[in-house]
Amino acid sequence: MPIELLPETPSQTAGPYVHIGLALEAAGNPTRDQEIWNRLAKPDAPGEHILLLGQVYDGNGHLVRDSFLEVWQADANGEYQDAYNLENAFNSFGRTATTFDAGEWTLHTVKPGVVNNAAGVPMAPHINISLFARGINIHLHTRLYFDDEAQANAKCPVLNLIEQPQRRETLIAKRCEVDGKTAYRFDIRIQGEGETVFFDF
């Protein structure tokens, strides 16, 4: 019997409705009790608690105020928690969106530990990010690294895949302080000058 392959469903841009279904708070709608959102770590989660924040810019340098991000990261011990449960002190998966006014996204999490790649080589602490936004038919994959992990960054096999050092800088979040708490700023530029490096994962 011949095998019939199903055609691939075409991708579509995120459109104006992604916030209604996945980012209720950002859309100004009542939130659900069981919501996957931007707080990956509860106060009792082990590790260094940090705030991540940033903005998304298009090729003309304008803020993309309706973008949506999904993140996947290891815990402070470098282990991925693949069983999502809102009762967990820490979950590896989270979501956030840029606000319609300031165009800024935030994540409350812990700084991830070192994870080995498939070959057993340590990768610098990082957070995987998928970006969904208007005009993007297939979401974009990037990574966030930390500027105070210079030694680990210099040895990271993934960062070193990027030949130009100045391009690697587009993946480095800058440490800062927000309301007395440790934070890292990571702005994403979809295209144009200073375009963020995206991966074909």
Swiss-Prot record:
Pathway: Aromatic compound metabolism; beta-ketoadipate pathway; 3-carboxy-cis,cis-muconate from 3,4-dihydroxybenzoate: step 1/1. It catalyses: 3,4-dihydroxybenzoate + O2 = 3-carboxy-cis,cis-muconate + 2 H(+). Coiled coil: none annotated. Its EC number is 1.13.11.3. 3,4-dihydroxybenzoate binds at residue 134. It is an enzyme of class 1 (oxidoreductase). Its cofactor is Fe(3+). GO terms for biological process: beta-ketoadipate pathway. It holds the Pfam family Dioxygenase_C. One of its GO terms (molecular function) is protocatechuate 3,4-dioxygenase activity. Binds Fe(3+) ion per subunit. Keywords: Aromatic hydrocarbons catabolism, Dioxygenase, Iron, Oxidoreductase. It comes from the Bacteria. The enzyme is an oligomer of 12 copies of the alpha and beta chains. Belongs to the intradiol ring-cleavage dioxygenase family. PANTHER family: DIOXYGENASE, PUTATIVE (AFU_ORTHOLOGUE AFUA_2G02910)-RELATED, PROTOCATECHUATE 3,4-DIOXYGENASE ALPHA CHAIN. Plays an essential role in the utilization of numerous aromatic and hydroaromatic compounds via the beta-ketoadipate pathway. This is Protocatechuate 3,4-dioxygenase alpha chain. It comes from Pseudomonas putida (Arthrobacter siderocapsulatus). The gene is pcaG.
